[in-house]
A protein has these predicted regions:
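SAM-dependent methyltransferase
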Residues: 155-235
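Class I SAM-dependent methyltransferase Rossmann-like catalytic core
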Residues: 2-34
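Conserved SAM-binding loop
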Residues: 83-84
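Conserved SAM-binding loop of SAM-dependent methyltransferases across substrates and taxa
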Residues: 54-67
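A short, conserved alpha-helix within the catalytic core of class I
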Residues: 129-141
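Conserved SAM-binding motif I beta-strand of class I
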Residues: 69-74
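Conserved SAM/SAH-binding beta-strand->alpha-helix loop
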Residues: 76-78
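Conserved SAM-binding strand-loop segment of SAM-dependent methyltransferases
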Residues: 90-106
Length: 267
């Protein structure tokens, strides 16, 4: 039986709306320049996008000459349909692969004889949409696929108090307190503005969602009634180091971007 989050992301109207209206505009996208720079300085590689969704990253992966193939993994067939349509415009070969990041059994067989270095990328806080235990499981699964020449690049949202960028709130909204509180409200508004979610939620639950920043867990949480249907975690550097340690991965580089940490991991 699918989880509440899977129900939302498998909704037929989500894929195209998310790719067109949201994923190109959300604040964390600006920090993907570090991922592009890192990949562009490598030799010939294949890029494996974990949770590729509608394939937004194909817009820049297609421009990197050393990327010889892109394999996008996602569990949502509707999102992969959007990705496949976008891939037709690409020069680079793109393979859309349906698999679950909790298992990756099909994908393991698929890349068994691969000779080129693989760079796994997990963008726009995809890992932060899982629980603590699930994050560890996903990273251990990916580690089990990696050879010494392979790398895993994560983009993880920073805690609000670490974000120095100005957050522009609507004029009618006033908030008392420090910049951290302002950033937290800005974060909630960012998620509140994801109107693409409202239609799927309304059709499934007949209720509008509520958005909440939990200061104890550092999660942005979306509720429908009392049900938690989506979380988006905010990370600290210390937390990232512990997560890598749990998954038995080594941090090659940890870059602090404007809104995100870009973490490069190896075995």
């Amino acid at each position: 039986m699918p989880t509440k989050e899977e129900i939302i992301w498998k909704h037929k109207k989500v894929g195209e709306l998310y790719t067109k209206e949201v994923s190109l505009k959300v604040e964390g996208v600006v920090d993907e320049k570090y991922v592009k720079d890192y990949i562009s300085k490598k030799g010939n590689i294949k890029a494996i996008s974990l949770g590729i969704g509608g394939g937004r990253e194909l817009n820049w992966l297609d421009k990197l000459k050393n990327v010889k193939e892109v394999i996008g993994i996602d569990y949502s067939p509707d999102l992969l349909d959007v990705c496949e349509k976008l891939s037709r415009k690409c020069k680079v070969k793109v393979i859309c692969f349906k698999d679950n990041l909790f298992f990756l059994k099909k994908f393991k067989k698929f890349i068994k004889k691969e000779k080129l270095p693989l760079i796994y990328i997990c963008l726009l806080n995809t890992l932060g949409n899982f629980t603590i235990k699930e994050r560890e499981k996903v990273l251990r699964n990916v580690r089990g696929l990696m050879k010494k020449k392979d790398r895993l690049v994560l983009c993880l949202y920073k805690r609000p108090e670490k974000i120095k960028a100005k957050i522009f709130l609507p004029r009618q909204i006033k908030i008392k307190g420090n910049s951290g509180r302002r950033v937290k409200l800005g974060t909630l508004l960012e998620y509140g503005a994801l109107e693409f979610l409202w239609l799927p939620i309304l059709e499934k639950y007949h209720q509008l969602p509520r958005f909440w920043y939990n200061e104890k867990t550092d999660d942005v949480t979306i509720y429908v009634g009392k049900e938690k249907i989506l979380i988006s975690h905010r990370f600290s550097e210390e937390e990232i180091k512990k997560l890598a340690q749990k998954a038995k991965l080594k941090i090659e580089k940890l870059i602090e971007g404007k809104f995100m940490y870009v973490v490069i991991l190896k075995v």
